[in-house]
Amino acid sequence: MTEYLLLFIGTVLVNNFVLVKFLGLCPFMGVSKKLETAIGMGLATTFVITLASICAWLVNHLILLPLDLVYLRTMAYILVIAVVVQFTEMVVRKTSPDLYRLLGIFLPLITTNCAVLGVPLLSVNLNHTFMQAAIYGFSASIGFSLVMVLFAGVRERLVLADVPAPFKGSSIALVTAGLMALAFMGFAGLVKF
């Protein structure tokens, strides 16, 4: 149980996919202008990454490894992710039409989010068990959502701030993202080697 808790905390805070591994920067910058959109995208991404990690582990251990088709891993994972995203899109469209309209083009773009593909690939490289892969996928997506919601909250406040003209827009957003990355580096002290 302690191993799973350490995996969760380490993935969410210490090895955050956005601020440490620099995966998923496109939705991080694109959807984080409004808090509501960031929360919706975070929930959708959490669902997709968690389910894709579980499905990718199953595909890897039940199909690719027994049939010696490991060289098809990336293509198989992309196919799994596309199916999971389409399923998520159908669920969001039926359950929350407002959120579906709010997310717009970003929902289908989850398919091309490098964090969604990176999590299962890294999980396989780390030789995770099924439970570890599920926790790793869930915690990576929680870390992604946490950073995106925090960043959206800061960006909403920056709109009201008196920012110098050269720093308005993307410039101050990138500076803020850098400061957040520095803050998350402080969590590295939680892990002892």
UniProtKB/Swiss-Prot annotation:
EC class (word): translocase
GO annotation, biological process: electron transport chain
Transmembrane as UniProt keyword: yes
Sequence intervals crossing the membrane: 5-25, 47-67, 72-92, 102-122, 134-154, 171-191
One cellular component term from this protein's GO annotations in UniProt: plasma membrane
EC number: 7.-.-.-
Membrane topology: Multi-pass membrane protein
Keyword rRNA-binding attached: no
InterPro entries: Ion_transpt_RnfA/RsxA, NqrDE/RnfAE, NqrDE/RnfAE_oxidrdctase
Subcellular location: Cell inner membrane
Keyword list, A-Z: Cell inner membrane, Cell membrane, Electron transport, Membrane, Translocase, Transmembrane, Transmembrane helix, Transport
Subunit details: The complex is composed of six subunits: RnfA, RnfB, RnfC, RnfD, RnfE and RnfG.
NCBIfam families in the record: PRK05151.1, rnfA
PANTHER family for the chain: INTEGRAL MEMBRANE PROTEIN OF SOXR-REDUCING COMPLEX, ION-TRANSLOCATING OXIDOREDUCTASE COMPLEX SUBUNIT A
Function (record text): Part of a membrane-bound complex that couples electron transfer with translocation of ions across the membrane.
UniProt record similarity statement: Belongs to the NqrDE/RnfAE family.
Name recorded for this polypeptide: Ion-translocating oxidoreductase complex subunit A
